[in-house]
């Protein structure tokens, strides 16, 4: 029986290096490393969005990556991509982040009743952004009701 000894070193994560790697060899980064790179950019910036879209391409079965990519798509008002990413989620539909993203999608599509259901579920779970989105939904509903009154009055 032969006994072999192998020594190896694990390289520490370097954010600046990871920012370069994601552009050329994203397959060399873990999903967590991609998340750290994304969060090093301003939320909603093109770089932030690009990293989340790269993550969902590299890890298409990871539902958190899909939810993050959907949120990034929603931030740039890309409803088609957001819906596609959210449709990739099967198991984690109870996550407040999923419900919030679906609520925002429904809000932007003008489906206020569905939006309210999703956003209330997310807010009930304690997601602060969902509460803010519910406030935005209330404003949209009020505006829509005012517009309808004006249109009906002018007939």
What are these regions (language model features)?
Residues 1-155:
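N-terminal targeting segments with Sec-dependent signals, encompassing both cleavable signal peptides
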């Amino acid at each position: 029986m032969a006994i072999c000894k192998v020594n190896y070193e694990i390289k520490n994560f370097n954010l600046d290096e990871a920012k370069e790697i994601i552009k050329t060899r994203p397959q060399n980064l873990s999903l967590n490393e991609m998340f750290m790179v994304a969060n090093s950019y301003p939320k909603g910036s093109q770089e932030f969005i690009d990293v989340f879209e790269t993550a969902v391409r590299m890890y298409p079965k990871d539902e958190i990556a899909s939810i993050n990519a959907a949120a990034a798509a929603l931030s740039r008002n890309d409803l088609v991509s957001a819906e596609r990413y959210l449709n990739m989620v099967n198991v984690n539909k109870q996550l407040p982040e999923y419900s919030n993203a679906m609520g925002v999608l429904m809000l932007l599509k003008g489906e206020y009743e569905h939006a309210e259901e999703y956003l209330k579920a997310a807010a009930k779970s304690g997601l602060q952004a969902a509460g803010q989105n519910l406030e935005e939904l209330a404003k949209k509903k009020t505006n829509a009701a005012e517009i309808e009154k004006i249109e009906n009055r002018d007939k």
